[in-house]
Amino acid sequence: MTSTAPTARPPSAQPQAFVAQTDEQIASSAPQAGLAPAAPAFGGLPRWLQQELRSDHAGEFGAVMIYRGILAISGDASVREFADSHLRTEQKHLALMEEIIPPAGRTRLLPLWRLMGWLTGALPALFGRQAVFATIEAVETFVDHHYQQQIVRLTPEGEHGPLRQVLVDCQADEVSHRDEAASLALPKRNVILRLWCAVVGSGSAAAVVAAKRV
């Protein structure tokens, strides 16, 4: 990535404030969706589906932190508008996941997700708008595939139909985020940025595996 000096960020957007928030504070800041459709209790779901949903919750939690990391660092008005809009959507997703997945069913790695998510947003923001857009495209490309793998295992009819629809709706938002980022990103990227995006993709895959197990 070609380094450019970031423009001054608003005094209120201090990185420490975002990193120091507890998991509960992050969850409480998300809008209360109240929109999760009726579905079987989490404990009654198949084990594989519980694990997938645990990774989904962790992913939405991490997504909130990615955009907070961007907003904490970037002073670019277009980047901030982009991140703020996406953040609101990710907060809604997180609120939905909080309704579906009880605290006992969530990964114990959320403190790590908080830090790593924030850094995934903050680091590219140091290098400018193109690094941010490329990063989001990489993240959302992975998320699209991750949701699709779950959706194809669930049928629209039956007891898991409402839950499947939640995943379909979340996936549609993530695809929209990916496409928007791709439309704003330049197709030609230097070696460092390509490597960074590869790390982001592989890191996302590793995070899913960890969230399912811990």
Whereabouts are the PLM-identified features?
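Non-heme di-metal
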Residues: 2-214
